[in-house]
Amino acid sequence: MSIEQLKDQIPDFAKDVRLNLSSMASDETLSPQAKYGLFVACAIATRNPMVMAAFEAVAAAQLSATALAAAKSAAAIMAMNNVYYRFVHLASNKEYATMPARLRMNVIANPGVDKADFELWSLAVSAINGCGTCIDAHEKVLQEAAVPAASIQTAVRFAAIIQSVAVAIEAAGVTVALAAE
């Protein structure tokens, strides 16, 4: 499935989402690896099979096998870290913040691709998953790596668009299912 075919699945009530998807696809703010890896990581974070399939198909033609695997790794490791660190942050009992996480996360130190790209993907997935602690940590690493604020903002904007595509498609499916009853 292509992005154009995915766009065709977005219902009219989400016209803005469709337009944002078109704009995102043609945006050249990020390098190709950063952009297409971000597409994959964020699509996985939506948990929508149609969105995942479309973005992986588009990205596979643009990314090396190593970069594609790293983007998937970013989504997987953030799925774990975002839950854990969001809990630590939100729990009233601050003792948890002093305890070792005891979670393996070696891929963050050695992602197999440019570290800034991996951090950008991790930040975007953390935005989708709503982990403020992870957002702050990844944004700090990106600032230290001299990644421009415009690139960071673009990554989060893309995450928001990809998430909205998944929600619009799911909402359309519910509408169709209810109409059939």
UniProtKB/Swiss-Prot annotation:
Q: Which spans are transmembrane here?
A: none
Q: List the disulfide bonds.
A: C131-C134
The answer, when asked if Acetylation is one of the entry's keywords, is no
Organism from which the protein derives: Bradyrhizobium sp. (strain ORS 278)
**Gene Ontology annotations of biological process type:** cell redox homeostasis; response to oxidative stress
Q: Which residues form the active site?
A: C131 (proton donor), C134 (cysteine sulfenic acid (-soh) intermediate)
Q: Which UniProt keywords apply?
A: Antioxidant, Disulfide bond, Oxidoreductase, Peroxidase, Redox-active center
Q: What is the name of the protein in this document?
A: Alkyl hydroperoxide reductase AhpD
